[in-house]
Each structure stands twice: as C-alpha cells, then as structure tokens.
Amino acid sequence: MTNIRKTHPLLKIINHSFIDLPTPSNISSWWNFGSLLGMCLIIQIATGLFLAMHYTSDTTTAFSSVTHICRDVNYGWLIRYMHANGASMFFICLFIHVGRGIYYGSYTFTETWNIGIILLFTVMATAFMGYVLPWGQMSFWGATVITNLLSAIPYIGTTLVEWIWGGFSVDKATLTRFFAFHFILPFMIAALAVVHLLFLHETGSNNPSGLNSDADKIPFHPYYTIKDILGMLLLLLLLMSLVLFAPDILGDPDNYTPANPLNTPPHIKPEWYFLFAYAILRSIPNKLGGVLALVLSILILALMPLLHTSKLRGLMFRPITQSLFWILVADLLTLTWIGGQPVEYPFIIIGQLASILYFSIILILMPLAGIIEDKILKLS
C-alpha cells in the first residue's frame, strides 16, 4: 500500500514541500533563517490576534488599552512583549536571510528573489503601521514624519498624504486604518511566503559552493527538520531572554508617553531595524532626493541579478568581493548607529559618507570586483 502522504491531494503538497523534498546535502546554518522567518510570522500572527482581542483603535483609548493589556489581561505583558520583540527577531532573521542570499548568489533565482523583495517591503510596511498602534509619542510623530515624506512626490504629494491620513493630520481615521492594514497584511505576507517557496521549489535550493547539487541530494525530513528545530529553539531562547529580562531595551522611552500633537519629541526616530534606511533618507538635504534614496536603498536589491558579473555564483571562492561584502555589513551597522543620532556634526558627514559607500559597493565596486576576479582566475 502506498503511503497516504504520497497519495492524499493535500498531504501530497506538504510531502513534496517539507518531507520528501530533495535538498542539497551541504547547506549550512545560514539556510535555517527561512524556516525561522516562518516561525516568526506564526508567533507574530498568534500574539497579534490575542492583542487585537483587547486593543481599541481609537485615539482616546488606544494608549490605555495597551496599558490595560499589560496590567489586567492574563499574561498580557508576555503577549505584548513577545509581539514587540518578535518583530525585532523577525527583522534580524530577514537581514541575515537577505545577506545570505547576496553572499551565496541566491539572487540568480530571479523569481524567488523578486518575491522576497516584495515580502521585505510588505513586512516593513506592516512593522511601521504596528509601531503607530500603541499611540505613544514616538508612534504619533513617527507616523507624521514618515507619511509626510509622500508629500515630496510632485503634484499629487499633498493630496496623497491627506488621503492616507483621512484628514489634515494624523488622527483617529489614520489610527483606525493603520490597525485594519496591520491586521490584514500578515496574512498577505503568509500567502506571499507560499509563492516564495513555490518558486524556490521549482529550482531547488542553492548551496554554499554555488555548484549544481543534483548529484548529491538528501530528503528534507529528518535531516533538515531536526536542524530547523534546533534553530527555532535557539531563536526562541533569544526571544524569551529578551522578553523576560530586557523587554524595553529595543524600544523608545518616548513611547511610554501618550501621543501629544502639541509636543514634539527632541529626537524623532523609528525602530532600530529602520535606522539604516532613515540614515540614508536624512543624508540627502533635499526632501524628494531623500525619499528616492530611501526607496532605492531597498529596491537596489532588485538590481543584484543584473549586477552579477562573475562566472562564479557565490562568494565562497571570491576573496575580493568577500571583503566588499563584509565592508557593506559594517557600513549598514554604521548607518544603523547614525540613524539613531541627532542631526549634527560629525554625524551628518559620517551618514553621508556611509550612504555613498553603501550605493558605491553595490552598484560599482562589487560588479568591478567580479570582473577582476574572473581575470585573475582566467575565467573570462
């Protein structure tokens, strides 16, 4: 008798995706972050659902409802901090996942890569709207500053901003619609993740060597299921340590003050995972230029397949590009630090230099290094 998992219409799909999936035998722990992102999404949807049961999206009661969740709801504090810090874990996994894709040349799977970029934008939009919901000072002013950037769009900008706000400022209408979008988007992310996997399974996974691994495949279960579970346990350990010992370490103290349109905080800044993009935005003195740089800082990923000049796929055997990759990582950490600093000397110039370096490495230096390495290896 054939196994039910191979014949049943629904189980068959799961079997081909997670059980009998042929997987390269040499993929390292950097390949764990896809499944970790899946776990993060499940945690966020589960905790978010329970938070939504007690939250009210009204400017007069939003802040109080979050306080009520933390004080009066059974384990409400746990759910709230798991959700807030779960977002940080989500972005840590996202950045590593994208970094792995760049390092090992996974962007050559163009469809998978492009869906991934759409996923990144969607997750960023969801996180931004979620940050507005507690209706603290940084929620309100963050929403005001970031939505206001759209007014830089010529001709339709101002109309567009007021349309998003649902009025002439960030107010009740804005909060209500942000809550609605924040609730629906994670389900769209889940659907996109399925499409992401669908395209990945058309080609099969990449591997650290960048070579074709068809000759050496192993079943996903039990080898990689057990490996993924180990990764999940380690991530849960990190998340729960954060939640139980230092839940506010990544948050902004200003968000414990209820939103007040009459009082601007001295330093308006987004959550830590947006600081690199915020630093790039601020490094250009022109509003429209800054907005374009902000969008391009992420959209530049879509150019990766076109900018690939080397005959070799990954960076495993390419020391020059390897060095550039790690300089890029250091540069992004520098930008993250600058994004959290006030706009004054020397931070302005450091931010501008780091922004120039960011675009130069991706657009000019890495493609050049690829050509040089091919010449050295006599591949061209």
Swiss-Prot record:
Q: Which residues form the signal peptide?
A: none
The organism sits in which domain of life? Eukaryota
Where, by residue number, does heme b b562 bind? 83, 182
User: Where is it mainly found?
Assistant: mitochondrion
A Pfam family that this protein carries is Cytochrome_B
Q: What does this protein do?
A: Component of the ubiquinol-cytochrome c reductase complex (complex III or cytochrome b-c1 complex) that is part of the mitochondrial respiratory chain. The b-c1 complex mediates electron transfer from ubiquinol to cytochrome c. Contributes to the generation of a proton gradient across the mitochondrial membrane that is then used for ATP synthesis.
Please give an example of a GO cellular component term from this record.
mitochondrial inner membrane
Q: Name one GO molecular function term.
A: metal ion binding
Bilayer topology term: Multi-pass membrane protein
Localized where? Mitochondrion inner membrane
Q: What is this protein called?
A: Cytochrome b
Question: Which cofactors is this protein said to need?
Answer: heme b
Listed Gene3D superfamilies: Cytochrome Bc1 Complex, Chain C (1.20.810.10)
Q: Organism source for this protein?
A: Gymnuromys roberti (Voalavoanala)
Instruction: Give the co-factor note.
Output: Binds 2 heme b groups non-covalently.
The UniProt keyword set, sorted, is:
Electron transport, Heme, Iron, Membrane, Metal-binding, Mitochondrion, Mitochondrion inner membrane, Respiratory chain, Transmembrane, Transmembrane helix, Transport, Ubiquinone
Gene that encodes it: MT-CYB
Task: Provide the binding site for heme b b566.
Answer: 97, 196
Q: What else is known?
A: Heme 1 (or BL or b562) is low-potential and absorbs at about 562 nm, and heme 2 (or BH or b566) is high-potential and absorbs at about 566 nm.
Q: Output the InterPro entries linked to this UniProt entry.
A: Cyt_b/b6_C (IPR005798), Cyt_b/b6_C_sf (IPR036150), Cyt_b/b6_N (IPR005797), Cytb/b6-like_sf (IPR027387), Cytochrome_b (IPR030689), Cytochrome_b_C_euk/bac (IPR048260), Cytochrome_b_N_euk/bac (IPR048259), Di-haem_cyt_TM (IPR016174)
Keyword Electron transport tagged: yes
Q: Which family does it belong to?
A: Belongs to the cytochrome b family.
